[in-house]
């Protein structure tokens, strides 16, 4: 297991309220305990801390991590079924609700299917699903839905992606 020395978090941890955090090991934190007082205008702001705590409470009480894990697995299984049906899907990977499906013109050469993925992204948008491209070759279909995304939503995404890929 790898334990990071420093973790920087931001954006979603305040659920719309501007909030960021830097979490460090005790050893690194002790380096700041040198007699000089560290000052930050917004550091430890009570409103921000309350917002962050509320977000953590909701994540825990509503079992959002478990939901993301279960819904993500459901979605990945559906994408893998599509991978068995469509050779254009060269790989499916991810964790929770952060998933990628790599589109290739050939599984042997792994040539990126960039024009095809652009069509898929636009047609998914037309059908009400916001997905995008990622990866150094821009051929990975990035699926990163909000936490409220359900298994029913995932099933609809798979059904629509199946229809689009059938038409390519």
Where are the predicted features?
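Conserved N-terminal phosphate-binding loop of PLP-dependent enzymes in the Aspartate aminotransferase
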Residues: 1-168
């Amino acid at each position: 297991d790898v334990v990071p020395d420093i973790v920087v978090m931001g954006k979603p941890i305040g659920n719309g309220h501007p909030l960021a955090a830097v979490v460090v090991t005790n050893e690194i934190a002790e380096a700041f305990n040198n007699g000089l007082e560290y000052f930050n205008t917004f550091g430890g702001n009570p409103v921000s801390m309350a917002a962050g705590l509320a977000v953590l409470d909701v994540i825990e009480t509503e079992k959002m991590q478990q939901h993301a894990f279960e819904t993500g697995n459901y979605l990945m299984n559906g994408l893998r079924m599509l991978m068995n049906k469509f050779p254009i899907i060269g790989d499916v990977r991810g964790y929770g609700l952060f998933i990628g499906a790599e589109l290739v013109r050939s599984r042997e050469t792994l040539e990126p299917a960039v024009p095809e993925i652009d069509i898929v992204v636009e047609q998914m948008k037309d059908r009400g699903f916001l997905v995008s491209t990622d990866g150094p070759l821009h051929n990975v279909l990035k699926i990163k839905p909000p936490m409220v995304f359900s298994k029913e939503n995932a099933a609809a995404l798979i059904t629509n992606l199946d229809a689009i890929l059938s038409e390519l």
